[in-house]
Amino acid sequence: MKNTILKIFNKRVLIFTLCFEIIVIVMTSMLGAQDISLQKNIISKNKINYGTALELHNRGKYLEAYNQFTNIMNTEDDMIIRDYTIYYGAKSALLTNMYNEAIDLYALLMKEYPRSSLYPYAEQYKALTEFYRDDYPISNFFNGKSQKWIKEFVGIRALRDTDDTNKARMIAYELLNRFGLSEAAIYYNNNFPEDISSFPNNLKFKTATILYEAGYRKASLKHFQYLYDNNAYKASSTYYMARIKQKSGDRRDAAALFDEYLSNLNNKSHRRLGLYYSADNYNRLKNYEKSIELYNTFLKEYPRDDYVPRIYNSFVTLSLNRNNLVQAKTYLTNVMKRFPKSRYTELALKSYLRKAFKLNNKTETYFATKALEARYPSFRHDFALSWNMWTAEEFGDIEKRDEYLMKTLLTSKSHYFIKGALSLANNEMIANVQLSNTYYLNEAKRYYADSNFTKSMQMLNKIQFLNYIATGKEDNITREARALAKNILMHNRFVKDLYANRSEDDLFNELSLQTRREVNKAIILYYYGDYDNAYTEFDKIFKKTQVTYPLFYFAEKIFKDSGNTKRLIQVSANIGKYFGYPYSDNVDLLPDEFRKRVYPRYFDEYVVPEAKYYKIEPAFVYAIMREESLFDPKAKSWVGAMGLMQLMPTTAAAENKKARYRYNPLDLTDPKQNINLGVSHLGWLFSSQKASNYILVAASYNAGSGRGRRWKAEYGTNNMYRTGRFIDIEETEYYVERVIKSYEYYSKYYKD
């Protein structure tokens, strides 16, 4: 009896405690939200506040900023962002050489806010400030007890900041010798290259390797050659020298060095890649027998390695170069069986398909298209349908062509593939699709009347908007389908909120409650104009929080104003997942407010006038920009293409010679410069191709005008979708598909 009473009592206490905690959370959240709900109340009304102090800091007026930050710290204002106030007060003091004051503030932040996102930065900068205050105690610091990441940070910052070359040299040596940091190696190479020659051999080899990895091949070759000549680290130096020669195009020298390295079976460190790169090198020297021999050695010694599918892809390519389809097919079927999901298996299959088609081998072409269809049962299935349709068209197999044409018209949601099919379709086919549309619309209405919204949406998703895709104009079925879809979506809270025109303070109150006030810091920082830190704080919350409309609303504001448009597109690209819309490939069915978030337009003030000047549709420019960079002005590719339209520096420099531009300095991260020069380059491509073929221009933009002219010569411009289908570079083929699909959406969702 006593135990029973005790259990009941404990249970009631637990329930009471939980209820009380929930009430406290709700009340404090509501109170917190109410206190700072409106923008005019969310920040301090005082003339001196975080925003005014931060503006002074950003303008380089560090002493004034320090005074304002410290004044704010002594008031009750902006307590939610007090850690930021302390941090920037410390940073302002550091930049004014007020080292003790900065150290005290960094220490205060670390003591009061151990869980702040600024804590590790405070720890770093406190150590750096102490290093400066104590006049660069290099030996004591690097031999001290600080953690490795602290030493690396302090060393790199001090190396960048000091004007004393002796101190810089000593710091660089510590960073290079202890941690192997590339910036230290590059510093030595650029400022004291003769010092590297006097390094001990172990450090010399480390430095040479770092320089090689950083792209300083010529400098690293000199040091590897020294080590090779002096019989120190000879095996590894031989390998690296071979790679440098190979990358610089000295293939015969590279072959001799690879042979020397591989001839000694005790050389294990780089044998795996040595075999692979040596085989590739001999392949490019057209010594196919030696290349195959080395590839086979690799397969024998490393049968389960990740490079095996690459090698089979190379075998297929080698066989195709000899027009030997039989041998190529043997390798292809082998790799398809052993590595069915590998990207290199797919590359081998597509290479085989293109070669069989060019050789007019119908049987093998159909073998490959069938394999491609099996590889894409759902995702990009219309890509495989397109190959089947166009190859059948080329071979004159009308029945087969029409089969895949109808499959495309009935199932694809890509304007690119549908317009390609429409270019070959007849009126009877289109009429059949319209009959299908009528049936599915009636079924959708029936399910809607029964409140079976899931099934109704499934039927709507089967409707094909052929007239809209072909002309950009909605017919009755399209309008009805989209209206019904909107009615269904309006049952979701996210969609309701978007159309409710709720006030910003109301959205903030709900979001503050949803996140237990965690979002408040990011919102305050945003309203003070501290967009970068607002983004950092907000994105952490976004990643771990269920996406409601209030969260999405503030994400749009903060991500856009902080310049993180790429991140905004990433969270908007499949916006339907936030309100239960599972058909991410069917953007047409969504209401305009959502379609335009999937395909947004940024930088209108630059795009529209420049596009009109060159008589290019703005929609095409937006499509290029979206697929090149996701509207990220600072984007940089692995080959060096930069900015919104991913211009190569040489291309940009050529366009910048026009009297219309001549930017000085040329800055490809500047949106205006990048867009203007990119649109100018598009104008040149349209002019040089002498065709209004958007597919050909997109392909030329990606792969170069020379290849564009070759494709034009091979396939003409009468049907640009035919041209796009037979582009024989994998990356460009997919690039064109994405760009033209985006162009079709932009041209329909926006009317200039």
Q: Which residue stretches match the model-derived regions?
A:
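Short solvent-exposed coil/turn linkers within tandem alpha-helical repeat scaffolds
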Residues: 39-42, 72-82, 109-121, 141-152, ...
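"A position-specific structural signal for the A-helix of alpha-solenoid helical repeats
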Residues: 51, 88, 125, 153-157, ...
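Catalytic glycan-binding domains that act on GlcNAc-containing polysaccharides
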Residues: 323, 359, 396-398, 419, ...
